[in-house]
Amino acid sequence: MLSSRLPKDLSPSPFFAELERTKAAVLAECAVADGRVGNAGRLPFIDMTVSSPLRVGLPVDLDAAVEDARKDFGCWNPDAAGWKSAREAVVEYYRERGGNFTAGQIILTASTSEAYSVLFKTFCDPGDVILTPMPGYPLLDTLAQLEHLECAPYFLSLKRENKKKIPACAGMTSGVDFRFILDTDSLLAAPEKAKILLLVSPHNPTGHCISREEWNAAVRFCEENDMILVVDEVFGDYGFSPEVRRSWEYVFGGKRDSRLRGNDCGRESLWDAGGGDFINLPEDGPKCPIFWLNGLSKAVGSPQLKLGWMAFYAPRERFEEIRAALEFVEDAYLSVSAPAQALGTALLKHSAAYESRVKGRLLQNWQTLREAFPSKYCPEVLGGWYAVVRLGEDDEELTLRLLKEKHVLVQPGFFFDFDEDGWVVISLLQEPALFKDAVARMRSLADS
């Protein structure tokens, strides 16, 4: 009766069922202890998997945005690509960061997940293959499966690097020597039916950010194999070093000081697509279409508002055909609501200030983690909201022991398809005092 798109078994795995039971028992124990006198030594529960800024004291000022946007909540002006005013707000978001997109290169979606779905529908047929990073976030496989697509891995490998070549993160020393890199040779094993290469930068969960050399290799691979390049950069605002680049800079050129001198991408440097529609498509740009995915979920910490977007580049001779195809798919759903577009327009004005608040938290927690664990066990994070730690025992046993003995919840590495045992994934969003406490407990377990 059910579609073959769905997994044959929808029940939780035995491990995750046990993890949920253990978590419930720990929470009950902590609740009882909180009500007793003389239990000051009891360890409180700390969630190191938290993924929403709303849960850790980092909300955006939504009330002010609502007042600004309320007048447009009842507006019904359907546009397959999204309201032009909202797309122009996204253009301004990029401009503040040195980007030169135009409104004609922006397509709004109800979420980043929906953006994937639109791209899969536009470019793939059932049975085609998406190349995804390993380790990587498991949602990507699910989204592909729901479109009758298959995933094949390419690899991020842990390498020891020359310390002098690794840029120091803000407020930190450059004494680290382990980091994840893109294994470009692993791309060569791609199946013939591969249609899309998916990069995630900053990567969840390793914190890898795509370098220029890695980018050039990925673009060359897509050009040679007539593939689409998709870059998930939902964590793009949260690079830890000034040396970390947004990958669209490799296509359009970066203007790092644009916040001070403004965007100088004049009309004379744009391509006239007709009808007064000017698009930034460099004549000497890549020969493959490229899409960058992002959204309010991370840009302003508002996953509840459900607004994402894709910014895209294509060779000039293919741009109009691709945009028409994307709008055809979008027009079938028109899933982006008026309130979401109105609020997004208002909130993106404050994205730079929000980015600064969150990045300060992330850097503080990353420093705490690196002081507790050497680079060999805690590889360099170049950006994002997560870090990985290798504690050297079975993932499942380690995760359960941390929860039972130390009341710290982490995610096991196998959930992200690490090819070796002993990895756990932790969020860098948690409140700094709680984060420091949790890291100390992790360290004590590792030393025991």
Regions found by a protein language model. Name each.
Residues E92, N100, L188, R401-L409, ...:
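PLP-dependent enzyme catalytic core of the Aspartate aminotransferase-like
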Residues M48, V90, I106, I130, ...:
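Generic structural signal for small/hydrophobic residues in well-ordered secondary structure
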Residues Y250-F252, S269-W271, N280-G360, A446:
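Conserved core segment of the aminotransferase class I/II
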Residues Q341, T345, G360-R370, Y377-L391, ...:
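Conserved glycine-rich beta-strand-loop-beta hairpin in the small C-terminal domain of fold type I
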Residues A31-R42, A152, L158-F178, R246-A273:
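Intrinsic disorder/low-complexity segments
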Residues G74-K164, G175-C222, G236-R245, A273-G285, ...:
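Conserved core of the PLP fold type I
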Residues D9-S111, V118, S335, L347-K349, ...:
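N-terminal small-domain helix-loop-helix segment of the aminotransferase-like
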Residues T132, P153, V231, V410-P412:
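Hydrophobic residues in well-ordered beta-strands that form the structural core
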